[in-house]
């Protein structure tokens, strides 16, 4: 830790301070924690968004006077889809001389990004100093390169590049070197990922071609319908503020069974996959600190979970199931996802006896699962005889959706008439941490 090499008093006076939000992705929190900067977290307000009053109080705190101050916030939560008031946060940070940086990974595919909006009044500065985007959430984005955009005024040319290597220099002598003056080139060490960069550019073009108005309208309609219908199901607990106007189309939820006990989040994802072919994500979505708040996990309980994980019991980690309602979905497909989640919340507990739980990994495996997995190789790809892919008509898709839902209900009805599987409770401290039925 380089901080140990510095005098504590000197460090306290000169150490940069980074204000981070209450719903950061790990990439916008752990990277700051591991730097020489001090990180200070801004609270949630009553509406589940960044508390601007608390942020202003921190900016006025004399402990942070005469130190470089940076605000680094998610433009939206990748867990609940909650959108940050980027303009208000930027204006507030600049009012006190701090830099305004935003992680746009969760919402860049769906919203406009304006780094230089018009000021609302004289002296207002709502500009953004830097944004960072991982475009993997864009349509066609997986495998594209990350994007960093920043205002030239915050770049210190007197310092060497972030990574000094090939491609960053104009000339290298026997004992010294001259770095390239052009910022973008001097910050691209080594051989660039050309295809990945081209792919990143193309996915932004797709977004622009469709238009954020179209994207926002479609996703808002899907989100409104999902939240409205799931609110009628007492077994579903949607995380975060349920107001669809405050969100992008990302929804995380948990499910309780008839006895009030939770179904494990990874069990939910397995049922959605096995019964309906719907891919969802289970876990904490790389947002552990936010998860503590959403799930009301206090520090002593958190330490107990940490101890269990260190002992190899990763399956005990709390979390949620996350689904996305994307703008490319038509109403039939969005309704299918909504209906499938409702089914799992209503009938999922009947399927517990069909699955084995691995406490070490949290994996749920069907007891009759078996057979060889499909081969992943060039030979297998070239040998396929599946023919050309075809687009299914709306009528055929609706027919298939109804069929899958009916088949799932038929299985649930059969299981309901069979003797209930005996539920298992872990012993000792592990039992105290067991929040789910199995």
Residue ranges and their predicted role:
Residues 28, 32, 55, 71, ...:
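Buried hydrophobic positions in well-ordered alpha/beta secondary-structure cores of metabolic enzymes
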Residues 3-70:
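PLP-dependent aminotransferase-class I/II
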Residues 102-104, 108, 116-139, 146-150:
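Conserved active-site segment immediately N-terminal to the catalytic lysine
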Residues 136-227:
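Active-site C-terminal subdomain of aminotransferase-like
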Residues 38-40, 50-106, 138:
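Active-site phosphate-binding strand-loop segment of PLP-dependent enzymes
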Residues 108, 116-126, 152-179, 282-314:
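Flexible glycine/proline-rich, aromatic-decorated loop/lid segments
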Residues 1-16, 121-123, 186-187, 195, ...:
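Non-catalytic terminal extensions of PLP-dependent enzymes
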Residues 19, 101-103, 132, 239, ...:
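Structural detector of well-ordered beta-strand residues that form the stable sheet scaffold
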């Amino acid at each position: 830790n380089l901080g140990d090499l510095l005098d504590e008093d000197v460090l306290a006076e000169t150490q940069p301070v980074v204000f981070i939000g209450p719903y950061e992705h790990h990439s916008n929190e752990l990277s700051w924690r591991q730097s020489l900067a001090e990180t200070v977290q801004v609270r949630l307000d009553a509406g589940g968004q960044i508390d601007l009053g608390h942020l202003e109080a921190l900016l006025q705190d004399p402990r942070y006077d005469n130190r470089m101050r940076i605000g680094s916030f998610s433009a939206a939560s990748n867990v609940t889809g909650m959108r940050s008031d980027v303009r208000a946060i930027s204006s507030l940070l600049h009012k006190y001389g701090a830099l305004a940086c935003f992680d746009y990974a969760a919402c860049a595919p769906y919203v406009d990004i304006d780094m230089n909006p018009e000021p609302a009044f004289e002296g207002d500065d709502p500009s953004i100093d830097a944004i960072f985007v991982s475009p993997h959430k864009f349509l066609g984005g997986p495998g594209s390169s990350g994007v960093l955009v920043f205002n030239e005024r915050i770049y210190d040319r007197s310092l060497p590049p972030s990574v000094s290597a090939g491609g960053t220099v104009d000339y290298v002598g026997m004992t010294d070197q001259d770095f390239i003056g052009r910022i973008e080139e001097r910050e691209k060490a080594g051989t660039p990922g050309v295809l990945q960069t081209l792919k990143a550019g193309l996915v932004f073009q797709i977004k622009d071609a469709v238009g954020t108005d179209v994207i926002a309208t479609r996703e808002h309609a899907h989100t409104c319908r999902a939240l409205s219908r799931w609110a009628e199901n007492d077994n579903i607990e949607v995380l975060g503020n349920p107001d669809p106007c405050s969100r992008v189309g990302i929804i995380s939820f948990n499910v309780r069974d008839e006895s009030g006990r939770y179904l494990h989040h990874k069990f939910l994802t397995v049922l959605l996959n096995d019964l309906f072919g719907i891919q969802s994500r289970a876990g904490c979505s790389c947002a552990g600190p936010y998860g503590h708040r959403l799930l009301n996990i206090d520090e002593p309980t958190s330490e107990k979970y940490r101890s269990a994980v260190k002992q190899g019991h990763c399956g005990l980690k709390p979390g949620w199931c996350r689904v996305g309602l994307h703008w490319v979905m038509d109403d039939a497909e969005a309704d299918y996802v909504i209906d499938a989640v409702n089914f799992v919340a209503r009938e999922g507990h009947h399927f517990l006896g069909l699955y084995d739980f691995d406490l070490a990994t949290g994996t749920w495996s069907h007891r009759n699962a078996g057979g060889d997995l499909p081969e992943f190789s060039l030979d297998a790809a070239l040998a396929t005889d599946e023919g050309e892919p075809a687009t299914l008509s709306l009528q055929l898709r609706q027919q298939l959706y109804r069929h899958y839902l009916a088949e799932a209900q038929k299985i649930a009805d059969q299981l309901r008439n069979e003797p209930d599987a005996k539920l298992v409770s872990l012993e000792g401290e592990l039992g105290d941490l067991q929040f789910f039925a199995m």
